[in-house]
């Protein structure tokens, strides 16, 4: 599907939007806190900033891409809605879930904030952050990065970074099987391992659980190559954070479709 095109684009410096319509996006932003009980300090904080394509795509492609973003960012139950309806639906469902999970404890702590000891103010505070950005319009493919942070108590929250990829013409999702020839895994794994060390500082590299990384289905495409994303705890401790490893196209031309 993309073999010669990807290789040629690297050599010639051609980017995907050349000769095609530029994709324009709309950003939907919401930032608010919703109290557990009226007058209380506990709340669920919701921050959303999501880009959705609005121009430069066919109607079916735009709908497919928007639904793909909504499904991974907000939940499958909101697919088929307008993007604004989906965002509002997510907020309402999240607030309901927060209150359902915590209101039963309100008589113990939340109703009597004056009785709390120091450090107890956020005992029932949750936080959700969702940010989605169009990363690249490359060679007939759109890559989108989605960051999701959640905190529902405990020592710290968790962050998830997802790469979403779509065929620009149709809006269909892109997987590794669409990009690489059969049996690509070993060759691509070798290339990823070769670039892992240079993607980290020495201390972080030495802390990894494993250096035998393999393709994990979480990636974005760009002129620079294919960038794989490894999440918190996936190949290293939480302190290292999210790890990105890029393999240039010219190093893996032999396994492209």
Question: Residue locations for each model-derived region?
Answer:
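Sec-dependent bacterial lipoprotein signal peptides
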Residues: 1-15
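Compositionally biased intrinsically disordered regions enriched in Thr/Gly
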Residues: 17-257
């Amino acid at each position: 599907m993309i073999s010669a095109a990807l290789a040629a684009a690297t050599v010639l410096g051609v980017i995907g939007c050349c000769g095609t319509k530029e994709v324009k996006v709309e950003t939907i932003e919401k930032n608010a806190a919703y109290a557990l009980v009226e007058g209380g300090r506990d709340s669920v904080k919701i921050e959303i900033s999501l880009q959705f394509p609005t121009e430069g795509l066919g109607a079916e492609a735009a709908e497919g891409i928007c639904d793909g973003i909504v499904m991974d960012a907000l939940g499958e139950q909101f697919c088929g809605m307008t993007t604004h309806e989906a965002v509002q639906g997510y907020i309402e469902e999240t607030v309901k879930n927060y209150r359902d999970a915590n209101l039963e404890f309100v008589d113990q702590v939340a109703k009597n904030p004056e009785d709390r000891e120091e450090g107890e103010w956020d005992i029932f505070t949750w936080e959700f952050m969702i940010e989605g950005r169009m990363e690249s319009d490359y060679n007939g493919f759109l890559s989108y990065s989605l960051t999701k942070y959640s905190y529902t108590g405990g020592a710290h929250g968790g962050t998830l970074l997802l790469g979403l990829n779509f065929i620009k013409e149709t809006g269909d999702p892109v997987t590794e099987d669409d990009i690489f020839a059969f049996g690509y895994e070993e060759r691509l794994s070798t290339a990823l391992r070769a670039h892992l060390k240079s993607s980290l500082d020495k201390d972080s590299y030495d802390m990894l659980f494993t250096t035998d990384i393999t393709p994990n289905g979480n990636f974005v495409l760009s002129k620079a190559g294919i960038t794989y994303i490894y999440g918190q705890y996936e190949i290293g401790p939480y302190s290292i954070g999210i790890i990105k490893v890029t393999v240039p196209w010219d190093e893996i031309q032999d396994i492209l479709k």
